[in-house]
Amino acid sequence: MLKKIVTALGMSGMLLASSNAIAEDTTTKNDNLSPQSVDLSPLRNLNKLDSPMDKDYNYHQAFKKLDTEQLKKDMQDLLTQSQDWWPADFGNYGPFFIRLSWHDAGTYRIYDGRGGANRGQQRFSPLNSWPDNVNLDKARQLLWPIKQKYGDAVSWSDLIVLAGTVSLESMGMKPIGFAFGREDDWQGDDTNWGLSPEEIMSSNVRDGKLAPAYAATQMGLIYVNPEGPDGKPDIKGAASEIRQAFRAMGMTDKETVALIAGGHTFGKTHGAVPEDKVKQAIGPAPDKAPIEQQGLGWHNSYGTGNGDDTMGSGLEGSWTSTPTFWNHDFLHNLYNLDWKKTLSPAGAHQWTPTNAKPENMVPDAHKPGVKHKPIMFTTDLALKEDDGFNKYTQEFYNNPEEFKEEFAKAWFKLTHRDMGPKSRYIGPWIPEQNFIWQDPVPAADYKQVSTQDIAQLEQDIINSGLTNQQLIKTAWDSASTYRKTDYRGGSNGARIALAPEKDWQMNEPAKLEVVLTKLKEIQTNFNNSKADGTKVSLADLIVLGGNVGVEQAAKQAGYNIQMPFVPGRTDATQAQTDIESFNYLKTKSDGFINYTDGSVSADKLPQTLVEKASMLDLNIPEMTVLVGGMRALDVNYDNSQKGVLTTTPGQLNNSFFVNLLDMSTQWKKSDKKDGEYIGIDRKTGKQKWTASPVDLIFGSNSELKAVAQVYAENGNEQKFVNDFAKAWHKVMMLGRFDVQQ
């Protein structure tokens, strides 16, 4: 029924932007394109170009001007200042703002780190027009006077999350803290939110399983359809979809129960418009609304269009008799009332009790003295009927204080998961407690290495017997786990020495162990030799080793470079590392080292390279010079010679580009190996090289070829080496928020 209601709202034709998220069963706009048509848009930082802020604007600096206590007071005052153009249910906007924050943060997915509250994407299409976000345009509009007052000192993305957090506190639910630090985007991103961009509310579930790339069971929803799978009131099926959807954003069963039960303690849902009048009464979503509506959508011509006539999801009612106060009445009602399937006025499947007592009745949101029966969603009842969820609903029902504590922790995780490590947090309300989902690294309790120490360590590495290739690949494998989407991964923490990273196929565990053993030996000897408290971490030593490898490779090619090195990384422990969570950082392919696990078809490999480069926050020239340099350095996965287009493997030079663009070589597809190309000498007919689609894309794609030609030109040999060194250092520094703020 929700799908029917959504269609009636005029949203069935809304198109969502495609994505470059790589999944075997993901439909994207590149699926039917040839390799030379690879989409490079993920490498263009259009948000920076589109930003109206001054070039020297720094949010962290601007934030220092913010009076956070006054901001909080203004937010608290706003909650009970009901506006005629959108009256507050029960005289309090708190539940409305909780939904705003939840739906903003709840788009996060652990698979690729996309979504979440960071960057304020809910302000833009397609998220601002999703069916599940119906009427949240009004919530953001209610916040505008506060945003206008405080200006650049607070971002929209921080303000939206703060609104829900302050609302919780004002209604009796004490949060464990709040961190500022989210920065705003200035346009909608290209995330692929579902399998079928052509039809809103299309299912992302196949054979009962949620497609691995997504965190919502239907396009246009944050998690699941509250009526049940595909709008059918199937409690068992709803439980399965809830578990899959919440797990896709990194939530456990316990956290899932806490969030749903806690969130549905507050507010109401809206489906007041009769089913036969919905299509005529409700206008299009914001991105299709008439210009005179000024960005507000879902205009409602039924009755007053708001208040008791509000139309939202189509479900209608409240869960508890105290919808603006924290308690555990949701759980009390869940277990002590008998629930019967009914329909809302709008025709949506919901449940009402057959044995409600006067104390269970819910006050009308706008008419004093009027009472209604409480409601439950199909998804709410799943928390009772599913054995896994029931364990925690019973536990929370019997232990209200534990329920409160677990909700507070789950809310903090929900609203901060995509912010990355704690070092990115700013503001006065940061909780002291560390959580494993923050990927914590220990603080350095020792003196950092000096310039003289670094020189000594470099010599120790040179004398270790490790090859340049071993050092370079280990450093790359460590640092290249970084994801700019949720700021996870990177070299800090040295988690390449821990499970699960040490066992990943792409890291070649047996070879990795040889390198790590030698570096640990150097680390131990150095640390034991220092009496002044100076120490070096394995994380720093891995990066320093990569730098040594690059410097030595450049020297062998006739170039003297000094790689920058910034110490300060520390080593995480296995106890600080969530194995299941970190496995999502494992890549299916890494074109920089010509690696693939076989799950990505050969014609998609160039696009996965772009996706990988985007995750590393690289631009087109940086990606290009790194691939060319890595091929010349001969650091491919499993010693593959694909793309090693040089007669001096291991030397840092521009041979890859020179030979790729040399017309004396003719390229042909191999008839023996899929995804392999053979470079044949045009005169002799003999094989000269082998290459992958990733290699050849730099001569095939016009934009990439233009950059490749720059690096192949006479006179640009030193430029190539210098640019490689800069790009390499950038990758090694990804995740070093301790020195970048």
From Swiss-Prot:
Chain's gene name: katG
Upper classification of the organism: Bacteria, Pseudomonadati, Pseudomonadota, Gammaproteobacteria, Thiotrichales
Cross-link (Tryptophyl-tyrosyl-methioninium (Tyr-Met) (with W-102)) at residue(s): 223-249
Listed GO MF terms: catalase activity; heme binding; metal ion binding
Disulfide bonds listed in the record: none
GO cellular component, one term: cytosol
Annotated positions for site Transition state stabilizer: 99
Comment on bound cofactor: Binds 1 heme b (iron(II)-protoporphyrin IX) group per dimer.
Stated name of the protein: Catalase-peroxidase
Post-translational modifications reported in the UniProt record: Formation of the three residue Trp-Tyr-Met cross-link is important for the catalase, but not the peroxidase activity of the enzyme.
Record cross-link Tryptophyl-tyrosyl-methioninium (Trp-Tyr) (with M-249), residues: 102-223
Keyword Oxidoreductase attributed: yes
UniProt cross-references to PROSITE patterns, sorted A to Z: PEROXIDASE_1, PEROXIDASE_2, PEROXIDASE_4
Pfam families given in the database record: peroxidase (PF00141)
Cross-referenced PANTHER family: CATALASE-PEROXIDASE, HYDROPEROXIDASE I, BIFUNCTIONAL CATALASE-PEROXIDASE
UniProt keyword list: Heme, Hydrogen peroxide, Iron, Metal-binding, Oxidoreductase, Peroxidase, Signal
Span of the signal peptide: 1-23
Cofactor(s), by name: heme b
Annotated CDD domains: catalase_peroxidase_1, catalase_peroxidase_2
Residues at the active site: 103
